[in-house]
Amino acid sequence: MDAGAETPDGWLLDVTESPDGRSVVRWVKERASGRVRRSAVEYRPPFLVTGPRERLADLARRLADDPRVAAVARRSGRPSLYDRRPRPVLAVVPARHAARRTLARAIDALGGFVDFSLYDVDLTAPQLYHFDHGLYPFAPVVDRGGTLVATEPAEAIDYAPPPLSVARFEVRIAGERRGRIPPPDGRIGAVTVGDVTLEGPEDDLLPAVVTEIARADPDILLSDGGDSFDLPWLYRRAAALGLGPDRFVLGREAVALRAARPASTFESYGRIL
């Protein structure tokens, strides 16, 4: 750590999208309290469109009354790394983050997939918030009037990591040995969260797990096979009991569990990988 660096107020753990579609949520681990503070700030970044000047002017007029668009501004800039001089650019701000890609595709179609080049479409609002504010995950930060400022550059290699709290997490099926394939209707008999092991019938056990995780508020749940078994089985049994994502909350934000990518099987020289 730079000896001259300012003492941080905390560490930026992450920036996520807000459910309202117009903001991002900043998660900061406070230095003084050790707790994680959630703060939402409005942030709707534009994506950029380049093309012939007259086509950009026509596009700006067409987008002015489009309900999917919050704002359109003409600028001069160098959106590409290969641009040696500024050129006309149209900055398009989607009304909601979820409309970003569909709006970009519609604009591309208006140009016959030839006239326009689009930039920053594939970057999410949290990614662009990091870039625009000089932030990065786990950055030590100070809060200056609601603006987070990193006290160390992203290129720093000698720095103190945030003091993350870790809790061991394990799910056990009643009457089954861990590691074996459970029966389709296997009931959860016990769940370990940190130093606490919870047991009992599922309709009491699963709400107790939510309560214990909220009480302990760990930054990391450390499990062996969590992605392949623990979490999917927990959510499966919660759904069987009628506990939706608004009631069965294992994180700091109520979100539904979904696979990051669909399951697939690959064959290579007769072996299933």
Locations of the language-model features?
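The two-metal-ion catalytic cores of nucleic-acid processing enzymes
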Residues: 1-273
